[in-house]
């Protein structure tokens, strides 16, 4: 599906390294659960945030997309470490809109980073790779997104999210699909790709009977309440080894 991206720069350009962020999340993210206190003390994390500030040249659009996904996820963590939280209405305003970061020589907030930079790249599966530090978000991966395997990573993230019963459920008897609000908020992205939200989900759901019904748009859709509680240990938490 990434074939739509076009090469934007010379193939010999050096690709931005996400190794520092890989070091951080491989240590401090377990099955989507984030150890924020540990990340706050991790020098590799703060070094990575610093490297994001300067302008980067992208080898191609796939490289660009992987860069922005990693940048978003890293900055979403920073918002929590800076004492912000999307759990309440005013918290969301502060977390997504008021908090600004320097990334790729731009000053930008998380909302604009997602809506003005990432979504226009035309890849709907990014909605299952981006994590905004909340329980109902797609689980934060403990692997950075890389251009050379981005297709496989996005496929995996999409399959995992859609088939997670805590995020999406399908009742064949009543033909009711209980879906994540992500499919409501970003409906246009899925419609542009597959015609309908149900058609998009049908491509990834593993139950053949559910997939066939979705492909025929047979389900009534109801959206599940989104859980905005933190997806990990709060940054102010004192762990046992600190007592």
Give the ranges of each region predicted by the language model.
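Interaction/scaffold regions that mediate signaling and macromolecular assembly across diverse proteins
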Residues: 11-243
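N-terminal signal peptide c-region/cleavage motif recognized by signal peptidases
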Residues: 4-6
């Amino acid at each position: 599906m990434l074939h739509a991206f076009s090469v934007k720069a010379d193939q010999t350009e050096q690709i931005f390294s996400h190794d520092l962020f890989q070091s951080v999340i491989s240590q401090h993210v377990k099955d989507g659960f984030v150890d924020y206190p540990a990340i706050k003390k991790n020098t590799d994390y703060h070094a990575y945030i610093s490297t994001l500030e300067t302008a980067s040249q992208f080898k191609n659009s796939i490289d660009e997309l992987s860069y922005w996904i990693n940048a978003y996820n890293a900055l979403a963590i920073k918002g929590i470490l800076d004492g912000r939280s999307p759990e309440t209405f005013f918290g969301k305003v502060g977390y997504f809109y008021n908090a600004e970061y320097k990334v790729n020589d731009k000053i930008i907030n998380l909302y604009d980073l997602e809506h003005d930079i990432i979504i226009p790249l035309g890849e709907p599966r990014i909605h299952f790779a981006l994590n905004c530090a909340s329980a109902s978000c797609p689980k934060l991966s403990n692997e950075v997104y890389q251009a050379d395997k981005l297709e496989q990573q996005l496929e995996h993230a999409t399959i995992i999210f859609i088939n997670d019963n805590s995020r999406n459920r399908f009742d064949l008897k009543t033909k009711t699909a209980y879906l994540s609000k992500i499919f409501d908020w970003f409906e246009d992205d899925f419609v542009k790709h597959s015609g309908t939200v149900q058609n998009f989900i049908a491509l990834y759901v593993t139950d053949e009977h559910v997939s066939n019904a979705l492909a025929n748009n047979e389900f009534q859709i109801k959206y599940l309440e989104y859980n905005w509680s933190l997806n990990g240990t709060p940054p102010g938490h004192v762990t046992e080894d600190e007592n």
